[in-house]
């Protein structure tokens, strides 16, 4: 708990598929997926597990005709969040979204949409947060703000976070441990420092390139 695990790999290696399996959206062709020690494929387990799991992906669009506030209220109701109005106000304030609360999400910039997506993912205070390229295509300032918030959330709430990313600097800054994927398999794992030392490289990017090219 309270840790951020990086998931690195080239396009098509299975990062997004792995997240889909952890959400119970994709059935594995072999093996079993356990989340919080419970089999996610078991229908009786899945609903309970997903009450405390959430995710962010730039490939999932927000409902464009709903306002920021409406998005959060609808999502919060799906999770049965208690004291929902207070929670929505609190999280909009934390993510500097108050001034946009009555604006439709289709009218927002990419950075603003990402903050709304983050707010949605945190509305139920998840124990496990799955992030698929959460800062992709963002301006440096917005990306840095999102990274800082994710880092603080893990530390303060004790959440476990899985971060799939192509941004090596992001992974080095945030992650306690890194897993390297290739062709649907984990081919190496460890702390950033241990992986760099093990493969005799100067930084994580060089280490990653060496591993995936072998």
Model regions: which residues?
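Conserved ABC transporter NBD signature motif
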Residues: 31-42, 48-49
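Helical segment within the ABC ATPase nucleotide-binding domain
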Residues: 144-156
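Conserved ABC ATPase signature
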Residues: 104-108
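Conserved catalytic motifs of ABC-family nucleotide-binding domains
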Residues: 125
């Amino acid at each position: 708990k309270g840790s951020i695990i990086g998931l690195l790999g080239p396009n098509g290696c299975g990062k997004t598929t792995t997240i889909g399996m952890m959400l119970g959206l994709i059935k594995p062709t072999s093996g079993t997926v356990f989340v919080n020690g419970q089999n996610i494929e078991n229908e009786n387990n899945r609903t309970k597990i997903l009450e405390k799991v959430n995710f962010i992906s730039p490939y999932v669009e927000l409902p464009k005709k709903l306002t920021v506030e409406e998005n959060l209220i609808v999502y919060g109701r799906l999770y049965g969040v208690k004291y929902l109005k207070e929670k929505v106000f609190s999280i909009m304030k934390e993510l500097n979204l108050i001034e946009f609360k009555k604006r439709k999400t289709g009218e927002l910039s990419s950075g603003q949409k990402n903050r709304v997506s983050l707010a949605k993912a945190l509305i139920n205070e998840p124990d496990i947060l799955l992030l698929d390229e959460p800062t992709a295509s963002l301006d440096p300032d917005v990306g840095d703000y999102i990274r800082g918030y994710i880092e603080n959330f893990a530390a303060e709430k004790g959440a476990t976070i899985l971060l799939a990313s192509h941004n090596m600097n992001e992974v080095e800054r945030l992650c306690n441990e890194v897993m390297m994927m290739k062709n649907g398999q984990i081919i190496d794992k460890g702390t950033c420092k241990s992986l760099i030392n093990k493969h005799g490289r100067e930084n994580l990017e060089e280490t990653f390139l060496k591993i995936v090219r072998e």
